[in-house]
Regions:
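Conserved MFS/SLC helix-loop-helix module at the cytosolic interface between two early adjacent transmembrane helices
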Residues: 110-149
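Intracellular juxtamembrane helix-capping segments at the cytosolic ends
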Residues: 164-177, 363-377
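Cytoplasmic helix-loop-helix junction between adjacent transmembrane helices
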Residues: 154-192
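A late C-terminal transmembrane helix in Major Facilitator Superfamily
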Residues: 376-421
């Protein structure tokens, strides 16, 4: 009984965490375990102040999140349209370029769990600043010194840096702007989508004008811009910390042992698999259905552009608790409808199914980022859950396209492989309800222990 009361208290006070950018209730009123978990993600410990509503530095943080998110996909997406040019110029094989394009997803799966640990030990602001510096170095390495070796090393370095931002931004939103997590996630997801679309659009024209190293290197400019507000935020955080304080390495819940965390991780993993498979193979499916390469390319652009509607729909939907579960099911059914349409739909209706797939996959991704904050009791737990879910998710995403390719070899048809995506989308729908449960991980764990 006592354990249940402590768990409920932790859940009730999840959104009252304080830091120099957002203050809430007095620390003394919060459970000791939760105070320790919060301290785990903070850099030097901070002096609480009571400040409700939108904090004075909130706009700075929001801009910093958007600027960082803008660089979380563009350095990766740029490679795809330039594969042929890079292969011919460096004299490498198609298999080598396939490895380079798969490297970011593999790096996300490998480095995501480490992001939460580094955030607890050194402070999230410090890790994010360091990751931006590493991102700059990775971009510079492969664009200024073009060779097969630097292409691999630079891509690996920038991918590891991006993994830090992927994991820590949702946790930072929970700590610094707990009442506006939806807004922060919307800015983060929109920044990724806009930069991905821009990167894909300018890569080839810029490469034809100045060579393929230019579209790879141009993102040093946007990364440098993103570094400026994060240096300021780190300074504010340090200035508010008491003298002599130091980060603590205490550990939150072990999310890897919680069934609810695994359900959410698999939910995100299926979303990632479907997304990367649609992006990678839909052009071939559409051409097999009779569309020209240009028409297939236009529908690919539609997929990216209309994804913003999914972000807006999920971020601004006025739902909470059980309503969030219905939203999760609804947006997952949108993915299922898109997958079924790509498989069974006629040529003239493909624009509709591509649109539904784009809206659905982006919506589920945004929802997962929100759930990292909403289903945890502290920023430390949010970072741990985010790291686990993204490690599992991108691990599945890395395997998925390979499986689709093998299935194509067996069936001899790209269209038939969409049946596999439809089946996986159905499984995603089955996980949607439990993944969006209003209970925190600690509450579900307590329920399991008491047989509920």
């Amino acid at each position: 009984m006592k354990e249940n009361e402590e768990t409920t208290s932790a859940g009730d006070e999840a959104n009252q965490t304080t830091d120099p950018l957002h203050a809430g209730q007095a620390e003394s009123s919060r459970p000791a375990a939760l105070r320790a978990a919060d301290a785990a993600t903070a850099p030097p410990s901070q002096t609480p102040t009571v400040r409700r509503g939108w904090p004075k530095e909130g706009w700075l943080l929001l801009f910093a999140v958007a600027a960082l998110a803008f660089n979380l996909r563009s350095p990766i997406v740029t490679i795809g349209p330039l594969v042929g040019m890079i292969r011919d110029d460096l004299g490498v094989s198609g298999s080598f370029m396939g490895f380079v394009t798969a490297l970011p997803v593999l790096a996300f799966a490998l480095f995501s769990p480490w992001a939460a640990r580094l955030g607890r030990r050194y402070g999230m602001e410090n890790v994010l600043v360091a990751s931006l510096v590493a991102l700059l170095a990775g971009i510079a390495l492969r664009s200024a010194l073009p060779s097969p070796l630097t292409l691999v090393l630079g891509t690996a370095l920038l991918s590891a840096a991006i993994a830090m931002g992927n994991v820590l931004l949702p946790a930072l939103a929970k700590r610094s702007l707990p009442e506006h997590v939806n807004l922060v996630v919307a800015m983060m997801t929109a920044g990724m989508l806009v930069s991905s679309t821009l990167a894909a659009g300018i890569a080839v024209p810029l490469a034809r004008w100045q060579g393929w190293t230019w579209p790879l290197g141009i993102w040093m400019l946007t990364t440098g811009v993103a570094l400026v507000p994060w240096l300021r935020i780190r300074h504010l955080h340090r200035a508010a910390a008491p003298t002599g304080s130091a980060p603590t390495a205490s550990t939150p819940l072990n999310v890897w042992r919680i069934p609810a965390a695994w359900a959410l991780s698999l939910y995100m993993g299926l979303q990632s698999l479907v997304f990367y498979a649609v992006v990678g193979f839909t052009p071939s499916v559409l051409q097999e259905k009779g569309l020209s390469a240009e028409q297939a390319g236009n529908l690919g652009a539609l997929f990216q552009a209309i994804s913003l509607l999914g972000v807006v729909a999920v971020s601004w939907a006025p739902v909470r608790d059980r309503g969030r579960q219905w939203l999760s099911v609804g947006i997952s059914l949108t993915v299922l409808a898109g997958s079924l349409g790509l498989w069974l739909g006629s040529t003239g209706t493909q624009w509709l199914w591509v649109s539904l797939a784009g809206i659905g996959t982006a919506g589920v991704f945004s929802l997962c980022l929100m759930l990292f904050a909403e289903r945890t009791d502290s920023p430390a737990e949010a970072a741990a859950l985010s790291g686990m879910a993204q490690a599992v998710g991108y691990g599945i995403a890395a395997i998925g396209p390979l499986g689709v390719g093998v299935l194509y070899d067996l069936l001899g048809s790209w269209t038939r492989t969409m049946g596999l995506l439809a089946a996986l989308s159905l499984l995603e729908c089955l996980l949607a309800w439990s993944s969006a449960s209003p209970k925190t991980l600690a509450q579900t764990l307590a329920g399991h222990r008491h047989g509920r």
